[in-house]
Amino acid sequence: MQIFNTLTRQKEEFVPQVPGEYRIYVCGPTVYNYIHIGNARPLIVFDTLRRYLEYRGNKVFYVSNITDIDDKLIKKGQEEGTSMKEVAQRFEAEYLKDAAGLNCKKPTVQPRATEHIQQILDIVKDLIDSGHAYVAKNGDVYFRVKSDPEYGKLSHLKLDDLESGNRELRSQMDDDLKEDPADFAVWKAAKPGEPAWESPYGMGRPGWHIECSAMSRTHLGKTIDLHCGGQDLIFPHHENEIAQSECANGCEFARYWMHNGFINVDNQKMSKSLHNFFTVRDVANVYGYEPIRYFMLTAGYRMPLNYTVDLIESCKNSLERLYTCRENLDFALSKSEFSTDESLKAKADEARTKFCKAMDDDLNTPDALAAVFDLVKEINTLSASSTKEALEAAAKAFDEITDVLGLMYNRRKDEVPAEVTELVEKRAAAKKAKDWATADAIRAQLTEMGWAVKDTAQGPQLSKL
């Protein structure tokens, strides 16, 4: 499999340190509110990557964190008159509901930042002892950016350019606490009304960037195979993670980096001020969760993706085509007699090959979806004339592919009541006798009972309304 490595800006063969075992870290949410549709993109994209690696027979150690200590959480708690911990616990639960609704597998480990304070302090000590960090006069601890000659290698930004052109960095030069405006906090001295922990530098709390470094090192080791997140995290978050991790550990932090693109709404950047800000829950309440997952797979993960109502409705319609196809397969397989055409077997193998080729090409989910619909077309054309073995091969390929994409998870098998079966048989007899009035009346009765009947070449096909 080839992936685009942000570090080298090129596609590379994705080779783990240990053959058959991938160690992956994905930056998770800061749980101060419901996640928006932009937050859902990395959640779905990298869950799909994990599913594909596992489908190909690999073991994946997948760590995705919960940021439960942050300025935004503190502010939210102050606004609500409650504690940061209560805010974090409430919105972590809501995040987990959304993640489950989107059919994202649970991470191997889902660590919380507040549960890793000692591990964070261990890295801070390593950085101070090695001269890469220093304690300011107020008890803040800052990473000394100029001590790392490789700083900027992920974002491809030069330190001189940052210092001269970044007003934000210059404004962070607070009362001469920092040696350099580019230096960033790995530990923040306590402020009144904020949560704090004991440390050798006085009461305080961790900086944002070092939380991920500590959780990654604790659960995946000093060097991981892949680090993932949104493109907005490349600088400063991921750049700072690399600097502090490699300076503390003395080795490479992550061998590969993958970053997903942004979500726009009606071709505009999503923002509350433009009133085009949608949470996952907002969209799911109208369309369900599965169309959101499908939507995220319709474009290459590195490309911008434009959210519109028309597109999400189109995604819902595409999913209905998949569900209808699978129902038709079940119906064809339920028959007692089958035809003789074996060609659907080869079509199933062809779809599987196309799917894997697409996924091996930097997680090309649009082409992967195209492979699914190629198979749908063949199933719809050939199912009536196929052998049982060919139908089973098609069903197996269809289920494998859609499972890797995380789709078709709302599929249900409805038990047909005896009364409904009896009515279907009576309707078939009425049609055979050309008693159309009775046949139509029975169809209407079935509809009232919540069942749709479709006449096919293989006989009447039932589905739950």
Regions found by a protein language model. Name each.
Residues T8-E13, Q17-K105, Q458-L462:
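N-terminal, positively charged nucleic-acid-binding surface of large information/translation enzymes
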Residues K269-M270, F277-L465:
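Structural preference for alpha-helix termini/caps and helix-kink/transition segments
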